[in-house]
Amino acid sequence: MAETNHSKRISELRSLLNKANHAYYILDSPLIEDAVFDRLYRELIELEKQYPSLVTPDSPSQRLGNKPATKFESIKHRIPLQSLDNAFNFDELNYWHSRMQKHLKSHSAMVCELKIDGNALALSYVNGVLTRGATRGDGAEGEEITANVKTIVSIPLSLHLQNPPAWVEIRGEAFIPNKVFISLNKERLKEEKQLFANPRNACSGTLRQLDSRIVASRHLDFFAYTIHLPDDWIPGETDPKKPKGQWEALLWLKAAGFRVNPNAKLISQPDQVEKFCIDWEKRRHQLPYTTDGIVIKIDDFKLQKTLGITQKAPRWAIALKYPAEEAPTQLNKLIFQTGRTGTVTPVAEFNPIPLGGTLVSKATLHNANRLSELDIHEGDTIVIRKAGEIIPEVIRVIKELRPNNAKKLVLPEKCPECNSKLLKETGEAATKCLNNDCPAILRGVLRHWVSKGAMNIDGFGTKLVEQLVKRKIIKSIAGIYELKEKNLENLERMGTKSAEKLLIEINNSKKQPWHKQLYGLGILHIGEANAKAIAEVFPSISLLADAAIASPESISNIYGIGSEITESLHKWFNCSINQNLIKELKDLGIALERVNEEGAIDNILMQEKLQFSGKTFVITGTMPSLSRANLEELIEREGGKVNSSVSSKTNYLVAGEKPGNKLKKAKELGIKVINEQELMTLISN
């Protein structure tokens, strides 16, 4: 009886949350408040944990996978995904249209759609439920990425139809919105990782992530544009009728719960097609996503069938491609910049050129490998492309215009800032300065610590950082908290009042959350998202340091944290300079651990947010990396209670080496026995 009641409640929650998602992401008309959604979603999760047999594939809880995939399976497309023929000007477009008219012998309406610069996906729905998502691949075969597809909230997990087809395939374009792309690259820039060249590459790389949590964090979007319905499908009373053309197909997709690009247009006159294309080429930079052309399709499905397909493309459609955003300019000079992790990056400076509605005068070459590939010389004429209409990049050199006796430009052997010898590790693209006293590295470290994503110290700008480093007033981030008015008053743009205000901001920054403090330390490969994930599992820097030094694998159990990050943490915490920095920061009042609003260690978090609430643990034996005190702290901060003896009320026995009689008693009572690593996995999950 209880399960029946819970089944009804789960069904109600599932239906309401799916409707709320559709209203928020597709209709842009929120149905319920975020806080209400969160509470209902949490209730659904808890009920599904209690009754796993009641979980359905279309439950909102299924958007995020339980564990990363090990690899993607290659699958054969039921219907091949063909590419489109391209037209690069209106003469070619008109030639295509005149050929169509000859075959059709009568005028036909056309549908014009914006060509989204993303990645094509094929989505299979069986009896209305999403069962498979796949990449285009070579058109005949793609990769099955269903777990990643489910994280895209604009893709419904079930069709909004009364009588869904036994099988239907939906096709469309996954893409990264421009704001998300810019934010993602800013994060990578802070971590000194190679930037994504454009949103399409970022989307492609995201879809191929084995961990769906990473995919979810990048907020991909999706526009549907094609359906493959079975001939025998009969719509329900409230369902849209079976479409007879592309325009009706878009309406069908919208009714079935998909996001359809709102700028598509049904056009009856050929001259209107050209007008549509010209209009959108001018307006495309105003869109929140990138487009690289216009797709024109004959509307009528019967006429499409008459026209047929070639070996690689349908005859009834064509893509008019926008001209590339490229321009030549002369290289003025190549400068080399040392970043906060010591990486030296070549940056091309050139005569300003207009691209994508902005003036561009610089382009980063990322690393020595790219510099070598381009073979840049002094005074070269270089071609700049605003890749993805956002990031300027040098794409080639016009060698025919190279000045006589021009000198080849190469990465320097010494740091441009401190003159220390540069080193390049085997297999790495980056060349680095390893001098801990390098002023450029210190400036970068300070800017990172005071940034909005870290300690958020308002008024601590770049000019101030430069002055403090140049005058040797500060030698580490700890020095920020030792500043006095007398250190600041005589600096540029700094009077007594400004100094007082800044010192208040510095003191207030000590209250920043633990995950922001961790991010601010600037550990290689630790971005904002990774710092937050790590801080949720390790509530203090002492616990994190113990694990990083003695048991890095316990950190790799956290979703999204791979060997690159664990190695970086291991190296950072083993460095005596960093160990001294931690001590200095703690002495100066930065807790480097999770605290509540009153400044106490946060043991009073809401119980429903702590996964060990109501659970009792007993610890026995010697652990491989963490002390008993560390383990107790971890368990208690997750809401659990630690007892000294095993009883029938014990939920878990955490056993290390030489566990003694407690292990025997736990087995007799049927109590779950776990080791240290399994405890860390429980916490990370």
From Swiss-Prot:
NAD(+) binds at residues 34-38, 83-84, 113, 136, 173, 297, 321. Its cofactor is Mg(2+); Mn(2+). SUPFAM superfamilies: BRCT domain, DNA ligase/mRNA capping enzyme, catalytic domain, Nucleic acid-binding proteins, RuvA domain 2-like. It is an enzyme of class 6 (ligase). It comes from the Bacteria. Signal peptide: none annotated. GO terms for cellular component: cytosol. Residues 607-685 form the BRCT domain. Gene3D superfamilies: 5' to 3' exonuclease, C-terminal subdomain, 6.20.10.30, BRCT domain, DNA ligase/mRNA capping enzyme, Helix hairpin bin, Nucleic acid-binding proteins. Zn(2+) binds at residues 415, 418, 433, 438. Pfam families: BRCT (PF00533), DNA_ligase_aden (PF01653), DNA_ligase_OB (PF03120), DNA_ligase_ZBD (PF03119), HHH_2 (PF12826), Nlig-Ia (PF22745). Its EC number is 6.5.1.2. The active site is at 115 (n6-amp-lysine intermediate). DNA ligase that catalyzes the formation of phosphodiester linkages between 5'-phosphoryl and 3'-hydroxyl groups in double-stranded DNA using NAD as a coenzyme and as the energy source for the reaction. It is essential for DNA replication and repair of damaged DNA. This is DNA ligase. The lineage of its organism: Bacteria, Bacillati, Cyanobacteriota, Cyanophyceae, Synechococcales.
